[in-house]
């Protein structure tokens, strides 16, 4: 599948994209919020969610998988970015306390390898957070948004995939209950619609925000015996 950066940028610059970020950020804040100093890796396209400073401050490194797109690196005083090979991350084993993944799992053709590589760089009992399109939603069936142009997952599918790759204690929350249209009335009342949708259609939100914990004794299956690093390994330890 294709990682279309232009489509993502255009969507998140639209009114629909902006209210989508607001709804997703409310869930992210719960999973990323911590008073502890932690190493957190952002993987995929997570730039829209960094506009909220309290979320951006939790993430100290952005890792953007290599594509045919010309990617403009994102830099500010809080985050640094690097383009990487999705199956051979240039980080040490057990490097990060948390990994936050957005707009990649649903477009990658090498799911097992990607997840096992993210498992490798997580510390013991580390947490991984995904934003994943929900297959039982209107959003995944309309192509005017990035969640409708990729491979969606059901709650049971993503749980099974993560279990097989060495993750447990999987928590799933839903958001984006308002329909994916740029109507002024909808945009104005998106919070009300979101609350009604959550109450009436709990498992039908457009996006799943998922947190899973690394299972220390599991060894994810890899289809390759070894990987060649195309960048020097990066350590975040001072």
Regions found by a protein language model. Give the residues of each.
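Class I SAM-dependent methyltransferase Rossmann-like catalytic core
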Residues: 1-33
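A short glycine-rich, Lys/Arg-flanked "PGG" loop and its adjoining helix->strand segment in the class I
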Residues: 112-127
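Short, glycine-/aromatic-enriched active-site segment of Class I SAM-dependent methyltransferases
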Residues: 133-149
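Short alpha-helix
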Residues: 149-172, 176
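Conserved catalytic loop of SAM-dependent methyltransferase domains
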Residues: 170-195, 203-205
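C-terminal lobe and adjacent flexible extensions of AdoMet/dcAdoMet transferase-like proteins
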Residues: 194-238
């Amino acid at each position: 599948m294709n990682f279309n950066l232009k489509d993502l940028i255009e969507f998140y610059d639209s009114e629909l994209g902006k209210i989508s970020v607001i709804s997703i950020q409310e869930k992210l804040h719960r999973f990323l919020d911590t008073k502890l100093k932690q190493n957190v890796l952002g993987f995929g396209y997570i730039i829209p969610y960094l506009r909220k400073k309290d979320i951006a401050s939790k993430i100290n490194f952005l890792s953007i998988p290599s594509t045919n797109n010309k990617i403009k690196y994102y830099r500010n005083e809080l985050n640094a970015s690097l383009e990487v090979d999705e199956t051979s991350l240039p980080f040490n084993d057990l490097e990060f306390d948390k990994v936050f993944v957005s707009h990649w799992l649903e477009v990658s053709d090498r799911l097992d390898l990607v997840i096992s590589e993210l498992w490798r760089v997580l510390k013991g009992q580390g947490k991984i957070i995904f934003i994943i399109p929900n297959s039982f939603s209107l959003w995944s069936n309309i192509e005017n948004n990035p969640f409708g142009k990729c491979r969606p997952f059901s709650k049971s599918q993503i749980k099974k995939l993560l279990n097989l790759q060495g993750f447990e204690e999987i928590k799933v929350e839903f958001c984006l209950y308002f329909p994916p249209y740029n109507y002024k009335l909808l945009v104005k009342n998106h919070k009300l619609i979101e609350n009604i949708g959550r109450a009436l259609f709990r498992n039908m939100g457009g996006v799943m925000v998922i947190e899973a914990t690394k299972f220390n004794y599991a060894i994810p299956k890899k289809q390759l015996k070894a990987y060649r690093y195309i960048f020097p390994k990066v350590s975040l330890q001072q």
